[in-house]
């Protein structure tokens, strides 16, 4: 019998369930994989040979495609991964053939505030510790591939400074690129949250001692913000990945010409690091349903999706395939809608919007909960008024999903402190907006608590959809940014820094770059670019401070507000509570 989530930590529940979990071959058989298509990494984890699977099942119709998104979250998160696992377990209880695709957790949040992305309570994926701490090495491969590009760039700059054109040609066959050190687009990456590395100087002794590099400003981002990670999420196959890898813009020349990884002759070696990472990984839920894990970009600072490859595999193997978009529907679902589905050609049958009474109270005026601190008393006291006010945020997201032509299902992710009156108000307002609504207690009861949720999703999947994109790629860049800002976020308009205006003018003038997709970078804690503005802010304008070019991933990246591609570690990080049992080797405290 499963442990009680009101009395036991997530890691305790996971370790207890892991005593009886299915072997990877049993999970593979459940999903319909052959032994040859499984590439085991121990007894309970495997990579999947996606090429073999897709070739074998090329004529099989796809299953139903379900995206799980959420309302604008509090800093604590609203249980989107938990709800994804709960939905899969609920569908399993109904005897449905089901699969999930989720993102690999980053070491940064796992060791910081948010924790892992395995779900929680009785709706988790296992084995928890390897899933949370490095897993099958994909993020490590991404770091190596990305940082190799920076090695190629910085060493090239050093050699061009140290040698004449004739010496470069004689020593290595190089021709001078003449990179502008003030226009290096790329930085270094690591898989932790470290504010000290946001702005750095490298090559400090490289001015007089010419063997120590090229002294210049540089930066670190978190690994999941890397364009290499984005490429893993959107690549269709190895050939597509190799082509995309060569289009990464690392810098510009002094004449303003983009310098790519292909120009630096490093794209092939970068791809070599990524060959194994292109295969999705396979694990299971607490109740033995298959879960694919592939790619891990955040939605606030990146594309925020698990991979297209994982979705294609899941749709061929299962009748119901559940994927997940990061954070709220304004950023994660918007990118699923206008980027991932555009790249993949896949059309969703249903979108789930996860809502909690806690988040609705926060959007309705209750104090914002702070990770690591006691929950304000307002969240343990009934307040239908706060919930009703906060529902404005939920209704905004319902309308956005409807703009995509998809059937929305509101999942009320129940907490034991929620009251019947609060839940009834959410149901009333959501149904009045035309959404289906399900109350789910998967955190507390696992699949048994998600039956209504699963049945509602099945019903929604039978409804005809009229899926359509928000914008076409031939629309001018500024018009697209303003359309997203007004239609999805609710802004009055958009303002641009001088730097952003210059970048957009340069990109718009390039016929190839001007038709790339649009991947907005914005806080996840508000519909606006100001994380302190809750509910549905009015009378505000989106501020674009810079615009990046991700030519390999296939999109332009407008960066809004003050958000950073390298998060910081808080004052009460999760790593303080992680340790090992030296007798058993078991890791404790991961959540």
Curated annotation (Swiss-Prot):
SUPFAM superfamilies the record matches: P-loop containing nucleoside triphosphate hydrolases (SSF52540)
Top-level taxon: Bacteria
Gene Ontology terms describing biological process: tetrahydrofolate interconversion
Swiss-Prot/TrEMBL catalytic activity: (6S)-5,6,7,8-tetrahydrofolate + formate + ATP = (6R)-10-formyltetrahydrofolate + ADP + phosphate
Gene Ontology molecular function: ATP binding; formate-tetrahydrofolate ligase activity
InterPro entries xref list: Formate_THF_ligase (IPR000559), Formate_THF_ligase_CS (IPR020628), P-loop_NTPase (IPR027417)
Biological pathway: One-carbon metabolism; tetrahydrofolate interconversion
Keywords: ATP-binding, Ligase, Nucleotide-binding, One-carbon metabolism
Coiled coil: none
Enzyme Commission designation: 6.3.4.3
Family, per entry: Belongs to the formate--tetrahydrofolate ligase family.
Protein name (database record): Formate--tetrahydrofolate ligase
Protein's organism: Desulforapulum autotrophicum (strain ATCC 43914 / DSM 3382 / VKM B-1955 / HRM2)
């Amino acid at each position: 019998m499963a442990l009680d989530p009101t009395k036991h930590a997530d890691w305790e529940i996971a370790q207890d369930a892991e005593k009886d979990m299915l072997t990877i071959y049993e999970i593979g058989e459940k999903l319909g994989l052959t032994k040859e298509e499984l590439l085991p990494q121990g007894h309970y984890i495997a990579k999947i040979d996606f090429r073999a699977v897709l070739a074998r099942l090329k004529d099989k119709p796809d299953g139903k495609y379900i995206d799980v998104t959420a309302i604008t979250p509090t800093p604590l998160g609203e249980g989107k991964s938990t709800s994804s696992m709960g939905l899969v377990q609920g569908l399993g209880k109904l005897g449905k053939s089901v699969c999930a695709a989720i993102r690999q957790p980053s070491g940064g949040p796992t060791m910081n505030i948010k924790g892992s992305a395995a779900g929680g309570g009785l709706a988790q994926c296992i084995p928890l510790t390897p899933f949370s701490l490095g897993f099958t090495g994909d993020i490590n491969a991404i770091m190596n591939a990305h940082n190799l590009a920076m090695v190629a760039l910085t060493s090239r700059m050093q050699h061009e400074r140290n040698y004449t054109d004739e010496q470069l040609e004689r020593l290595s066959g190089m021709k001078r690129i003449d990179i502008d050190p003030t226009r290096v687009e790329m930085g270094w990456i690591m898989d932790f949250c470290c504010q000290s590395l946001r702005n750095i100087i490298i090559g400090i002794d490289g001015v007089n001692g010419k063997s120590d590099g090229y002294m210049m400003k540089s930066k670190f981002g978190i690994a999941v913000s890397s364009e290499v990670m984005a490429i893993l999420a959107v690549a269709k196959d190895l050939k597509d990945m190799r082509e995309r890898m060569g289009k990464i813009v690392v810098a510009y020349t002094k004449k303003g010409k983009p310098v790519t990884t292909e120009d630096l002759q490093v794209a092939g070696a970068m791809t070599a690091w990524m060959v194994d990472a292109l295969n999705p990984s396979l694990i299971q839920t607490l109740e033995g349903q298959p879960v694919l894990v592939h790619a891990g970009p955040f939605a606030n600072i990146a594309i925020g999706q698990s991979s297209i490859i994982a979705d294609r595999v899941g749709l061929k193997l299962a009748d119901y395939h559940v994927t997940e978009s990061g954070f709220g529907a304004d950023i994660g679902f918007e990118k699923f809608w206008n980027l991932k589905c555009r790249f993949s050609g896949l059309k969703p049958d249903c979108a789930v919007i996860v809502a909690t009474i806690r988040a609705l109270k926060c959007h309705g005026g209750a104090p914002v909960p702070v990770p690591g601190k006691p929950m304000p008393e307002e969240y343990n006291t009934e307040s239908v008024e706060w919930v009703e006010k906060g529902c404005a945020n939920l209704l905004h997201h319902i309308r956005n999903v409807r703009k995509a032509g998809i059937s929305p299902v509101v999942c009320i992710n129940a907490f034991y402190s929620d009251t019947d009156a609060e839940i009834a108000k959410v149901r009333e307002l959501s149904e009045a907006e035309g959404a289906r609504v399900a109350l789910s207690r998967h955190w507390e009861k696992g699949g048994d608590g998600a039956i209504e949720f699963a049945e509602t999703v099945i019903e929604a999947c039978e409804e005809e959809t009229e899926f359509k994109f928000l914008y076409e790629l031939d629309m001018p860049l500024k018009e697209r940014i303003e359309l997203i800002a007004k239609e999805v976020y609710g802004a009055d308009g958009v303002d641009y820094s001088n730097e952003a205006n210059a970048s957009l003018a340069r990109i718009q003038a390039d016929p190839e770059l001007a038709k790339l997709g649009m991947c907005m970078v914005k806080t996840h804690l508000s519909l606006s670019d100001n994380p302190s503005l809750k509910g549905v802010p009015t009378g505000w304008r989106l501020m674009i401070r810079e615009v990046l070019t991700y030519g390999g991933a296939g999109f332009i990246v407008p960066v809004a507000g003050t958000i950073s591609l390298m998060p910081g570690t808080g004052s009460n990080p999760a790593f303080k509570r992680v340790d090992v049992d030296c007798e058993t080797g078991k890791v404790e405290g991961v959540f």
